[in-house]
């Protein structure tokens, strides 16, 4: 019996896939089809896959062509599969010609001509593209525009900004003009403008991805989420850390008891990028420390320990009434504590520590760009290290989640509304000087 194996993602299974599978089957007596796992696709930079692994497996199975279906989960698995399953022929589309010649050492390699003019990428791209308008003065806007190039189903309609140094395609003179030419907005304007801009966009039934905080008070945050529901719009916090694979896995391991009961969390995030503006007291258009770094630092605290803390203390070193160069927030829960330290006028090691009764999780600086973390125990021999590919600082994964939410009309679960509201509540208390102590 001649055994044949082939691999693919098989997203949005189409005629071209089926013809290739039929030709593969004709090469032998028994066809094994390897379907790529979601995480494996992400590690290869394939982030636009529309269907889940099980949906793709079911689609391949429904063709009746495959005799056996396996899952491809890691780099180098093809050699393992060929040897383990006794494969005689490995086959793949001709667009990969030469790529798998090294497998000739283990079996015969056959490249099959693909059906011209048909591909999953083209099918995904042909779906109605979301026109994304970008609003704001920070250079992160340029990164977002660049990352849009890697995400199917999205195109940048233009930018509304007062920063003449930002170079993003078409520039609009007014916020309203950008709104009229966009289906959705990415907002990174000054936090004092967020509520007004988000409300105006949602009133016109535009979807919004906004750099947290989405508002400067709990009441405003609740109003925006309620309005989004009423208008059938997606409103998402843009916290890129939440969408990275490594960070998500780290949170799951922490909550799953890998380090025992969690007693303490310490998150630090600082930057001196704006130190020249701060030294000149020219910060009217600059994000302060609590808004720039607070939401990111609150993310793991609230995701792991929840938002129902007993009390908190905000300790700040102020440049003026609205601008903190350093802030420390201490949260006290019934059975745990957490501390965040953020600063734009102070420098510290930007690490994340999660302490439990059995061990601790260590995420090195810059922890908010999570691609690596360690679980450490009393016995170093038990320590575990985890690494996951992170492309585009997590921005492209954030954009994919946003587009998926718009297309599915379902709010994603990366950042809950309770968490979004809790972030705004802490920032409101900072401005109101509630639970507050000022350093001289």
Segment roles from a protein language model:
Residues 1-130:
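Nucleotidyltransferase catalytic core that binds NTPs
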Residues 33, 210-211, 235-237, 363:
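Hydrophobic residues in well-ordered beta-strands that form the structural core
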Residues 129-168, 403:
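N-terminal Rossmann-like dinucleotide-binding module
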Residues 134-135, 160, 184-189, 401-440:
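C-terminal helix-rich "cap/oligomerization" subdomain common to oxidoreductases
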Residues 170-225:
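Beta-loop-alpha module in the N-terminal Rossmann-like domain of NAD(P)-dependent dehydrogenases
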Residues 223-240, 261-265:
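Rossmann-fold dehydrogenase core element
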Residues 241-311:
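Predominantly a Rossmann-like dinucleotide-binding segment in NAD(P)-dependent oxidoreductases
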Residues 292-369, 399-410:
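Contiguous beta-strand/loop segments that form the cofactor/metal-binding neighborhood of enzyme cores
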């Amino acid at each position: 019996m001649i055994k044949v194996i082939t691999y693919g993602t098989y997203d949005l299974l189409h005629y071209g896939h089926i013809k290739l599978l039929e030709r593969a089957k004709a090469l032998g007596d028994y066809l094994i089809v390897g379907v790529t796992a979601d995480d494996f696709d992400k590690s290869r930079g394939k982030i636009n896959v529309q269907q889940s692994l099980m949906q793709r497996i079911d689609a391949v199975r429904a063709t009746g062509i495959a005799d056996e279906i396996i899952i491809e989960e890691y780099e180098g698995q093809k050699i393992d599969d060929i040897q383990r399953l006794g494969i005689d022929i490995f086959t793949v589309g001709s667009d990969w010609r030469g790529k798998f010649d090294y497998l000739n050492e283990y079996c015969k390699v056959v490249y099959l001509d693909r059906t011209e003019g048909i591909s999953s990428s083209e099918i995904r791209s042909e779906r109605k593209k979301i026109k994304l308008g970008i609003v704001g003065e920070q250079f992160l806007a340029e990164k977002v525009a660049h990352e849009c190039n890697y995400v199917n189903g999205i195109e940048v309609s233009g930018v509304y900004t007062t920063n003449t140094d930002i170079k993003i395609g078409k520039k609009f003179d007014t916020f309203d003009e950008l709104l009229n030419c966009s289906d959705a907005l990415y907002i990174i304007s000054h936090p004092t403008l967020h509520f007004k801009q988000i409300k105006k966009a949602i009133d016109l039934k535009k979807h919004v991805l906004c750099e947290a905080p989405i508002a400067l008070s709990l009441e405003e945050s609740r109003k925006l989420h309620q309005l989004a529901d009423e208008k059938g719009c997606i409103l998402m916090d843009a916290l890129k850390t939440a969408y990275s694979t490594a960070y998500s896995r780290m949170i799951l391991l922490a909550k799953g008891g890998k380090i025992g009961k969690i007693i303490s969390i310490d998150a630090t995030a600082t930057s001196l990028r704006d130190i020249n503006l701060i030294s000149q007291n020219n910060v009217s258009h600059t994000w302060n420390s609590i808004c720039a770094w607070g939401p990111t630092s609150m993310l793991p605290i609230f995701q792991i320990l929840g938002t129902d803390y007993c009390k908190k203390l905000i300790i700040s070193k102020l440049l003026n009434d609205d601008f903190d160069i350093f802030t420390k927030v201490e949260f006290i829960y019934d059975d745990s504590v957490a501390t965040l330290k953020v600063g734009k006028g102070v420098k510290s090691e930007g690490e994340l520590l999660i302490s439990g009764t059995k061990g601790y999780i260590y995420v090195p600086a810059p922890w908010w760009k999570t691609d690596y973390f360690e679980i450490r125990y009393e016995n170093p021999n038990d320590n575990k290290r985890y690494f996951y590919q992170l492309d585009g600082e997590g921005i492209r994964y954030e954009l994919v989640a946003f587009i998926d939410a718009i297309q599915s009309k379902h709010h994603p679960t990366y950042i809950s509304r309770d968490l979004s509201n809790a972030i705004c509540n802490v920032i409101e208390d900072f401005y109101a000087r509630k639970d507050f102590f000022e350093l001289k």
